[in-house]
Amino acid sequence: KCPDISSGRLNPTNSEYVIKNLDFGIDACMKSKDLGLVTGPISKENIVEGGYSFSGHTERIMEKTNSDDVLMLLASERLKVALATTHMPLNKVSESVTTDLIINKVKILNQELKSKFNIEKPKISLLGLNPHAGEGGKLGKEEIEIIIPAVKELIASNVDVSMPLSADTAFNKNLLDETDAYFAMYHDQGLPVLKALSFGDSINITLGVPIVRTSVDHGVALDIAGKGIANNRSEEHTSE
């Protein structure tokens, strides 16, 4: 039986339906390499209220495909931004950013830029965690103790990645033109810039998993549901 649907209103009883359809799509793609998964926006809050432990599509795909690691990449024609951490409270980010995490995820990004985007020698601009990238340890020690050791190991592995950059100036035009992808430490560090430049024209791509998955760059937008004013450009780009 189809769950009750009211335009513009969340219903936690729909959570099971949403999760089952997502899992069905993941399983189908695992069985056939000719298939890809395109997902629409869902309310994480609504899924959790429906009784599921759920932090996002990306994390669910990682779990269902038994992948060791996964990387969220938002991409448009102008800009690509990958995330070290995804959907977590800001006060958890610092403890979650480790040297191994950075190494693993930047290696995924480097490899997938080559294989999926045909970039022979990707140039990655990596953002620091703290304001001014820690300013020599005066505004935080994470750059010195965690991030720079990761970058040094990546460079030794022939990955073209920058030392941690101050996020407030890293998206200047000159660097933007020279960068194939940015690596941000948390969700709201890199994505506001991408969405300011390309909102509605960018897509979400899951890297590091054995299936192709793309998604729109926006949320459920309940405030405009049923009004006929939604912009579907991002949805069109997900299938290109």
Predicted regions span which residues?
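Active-site glycine-rich loop that binds ribose-phosphate moieties when present
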Residues: 60-68, 88-114
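Short, basic/glycine-rich phosphate-binding loops at helix/coil junctions
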Residues: 1-7, 81-89
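Glycine/threonine-rich beta-strand-loop-alpha-helix active-site module
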Residues: 49-71
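Short, structured patches in soluble enzyme cores that scaffold and shape functional sites
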Residues: 77, 85-88, 128-130
